[in-house]
Amino acid sequence: MMTYSEYKSVPHLWDISIPSHWKVLPLYAIAKEKSICNCTDLQLLSVYLDEGVVPFSTRTERRTNATSADLSKYQRVDAGDFVLNNQQAWRGSVGVSRHTGIVSPAYVVLQMDDTLISEYANYLLRSRIMVDQYLINSKSVGSIQRNIYW
């Protein structure tokens, strides 16, 4: 793990310390929503709790939701984009993609700022601390059907 000579405390952010030259920014300042459709020639991607964003073809278990026959409304995802399953984010179904492909129109796709390191963003945005924030900031009817709105 890389170490730095100086750190600063971030008490409003879980009372942690970060390298002193790092900025603390809200998600909306480093990400913007995008929705590019009609990319039906790209591979199908999905978001899983245990892996984040992966090619759909790499998973073998049965799915409860069938893939649509018409992929024209599916959204383009590029490597480095943050993909959020807005109904399952509270459980951790989020990730920064390493792949280019398309995801369900039910997902939220955010283009991340180029200054972010994708691997670190994936680690942070999938961390327990962030997943807890998705739970806190989601709305629900009952305890299972929760949605997070961007």
Region spans (language model):
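Structural motif
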Residues: 78-81
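A generic structural signal for residues embedded in beta-strands
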Residues: 84-85
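Residue-level "contact hotspot" at macromolecular interaction interfaces
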Residues: 73-76
